[in-house]
Each structure stands twice: as C-alpha cells, then as structure tokens.
C-alpha cells in the first residue's frame, strides 16, 4: 500500500513480520552462541524463543527507524531491566552489550543500517524502503482480517 509507514501499523505485528522476513531471507548472520546466552545481567534464564535473535534485530531496526542515531550504549539501555538482588533493593541493569553489538553488526552486513558520522547507527535508504514495504504488507493483512 502506498503511503503506509512503520508508524501506521501495529508494532507487534510489524516486528513479527520483519523477523520472519529476516529469517526467510537467510542473510542475517546469527552467531553460534545464541542458544547459550542471557540477554542481560538482570535475566535469570536464556530466552525461551529460538528465534529471539531475529526478533531482537527486527526490534532494533524499528527503533532506528523511529529515532535514529542510536548505538550500542543506547540499545543496552533500551533492553535493560530490573535487577533483583534478593533481600537487597532492586536496581536498574543494562542489557547485554555483546548482543546489541552483534545485532547491529549483522544488520550492517545486510546494508539495512550504516554508521552515522555523528555517532551511533542510522537506517539506509534501502533499509527504510524494506521497512515501509513490510509495513504495507502488515497493513494490508490486517485490513483483510477486519473485512
């Protein structure tokens, strides 16, 4: 659909559709250790979803589409959470820097994002075009369900 952007569609459906697109394309380089790693110090267990790397990559691209100029440090703050310390008070803890770095590097190899000269990463024209195309597909699918 012309004129449909990422901001116009349901974000959960969009992230799922983009993750499916990244997995189906087979070009996203997934590290060998994805089934062993926790996503942050504040997590007790590794993710239960086996496709979590694709979902994280899709979520990261969506975030860069909406805000842009985010780097590894910004992504660790976004994916951080509450660190439980037993009987001591809970505090905020950042997400895994290695996971954020590997996701950004994998997306750079796909030419969806590039390094911003002002710091961080930003979407390329090809990445924006792909995201808008997938948003159009999600919008068309949701309109088909409503009718």
UniProtKB/Swiss-Prot annotation:
Which UniProt keywords are listed?
Answer: Cytoplasm, Nucleus, Ribonucleoprotein, Ribosomal protein
Segments crossing the lipid bilayer: none
Q: Which SMART domains match?
A: Ribosomal_S19e
Task: Give the principal location in a single coarse category.
Answer: cytoplasm
Protein location: Cytoplasm; Nucleus
Q: Which InterPro entries match?
A: Ribosomal_eS19, Ribosomal_eS19_CS, WH-like_DNA-bd_sf, WH_DNA-bd_sf
Cross-referenced Pfam families: Ribosomal_S19e (PF01090)
Q: Name one GO biological process term.
A: translation
Q: Which GO terms describe its cellular component?
A: cytosolic small ribosomal subunit; nucleus
Question: Tell me, what is one Gene Ontology molecular-function annotation carried by this entry?
Answer: structural constituent of ribosome
UniProt lists the family membership as follows: Belongs to the eukaryotic ribosomal protein eS19 family.
Assembly with partners or alone: Component of the small ribosomal subunit.
- Sum up the protein's function in the record's words: Component of the small ribosomal subunit. The ribosome is a large ribonucleoprotein complex responsible for the synthesis of proteins in the cell. Required for pre-rRNA processing and maturation of 40S ribosomal subunits.
Name of this chain's protein: Small ribosomal subunit protein eS19
Query: Source species, please?
Result: Gillichthys mirabilis (Long-jawed mudsucker)
Query: Per UniProt, what is the name of the gene that codes for the protein in this document?
Result: rps19
